[in-house]
């Protein structure tokens, strides 16, 4: 049997402020549950969806590691979740995030593994590697 999808669940400190954070870089609130909300979801496009759980289901917290190119494993001190988000234009997304005052920890860069990427950190410590594939240099 094959999986039909995968939806990460992020432990966040506040559903409403996290939804607002995602909206700053183009995501939309899909739904929330509870009064006040303690669970919800944001989405982008046809397929991308992330569940948000206030204070449960996984870790959160800011580590000292701002990119993936520093320490390994437990030494990194990361408590949040790292995810890759694929977009059409990394540079345009970077401009949008900077204009919205979001924390970009690594600017758009062509990496040796044929991906142009930037890193964006959520206030609860989760890091998003925003990227797109690029042609291999010959």
Segments (PLM) and residue ranges:
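Conserved active-site tyrosine of GNAT-family acetyltransferases
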Residues: 18-22, 97, 125
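Short C-terminal beta-strand
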Residues: 127-131
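Short, surface-exposed ligand-recognition loops at beta-strand->loop->(often short) alpha-helix junctions
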Residues: 11-13
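Vicinal oxygen chelate
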Residues: 1-9, 24-121, 132-138
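Alpha-helical macromolecular-interaction surfaces
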Residues: 16-17, 92
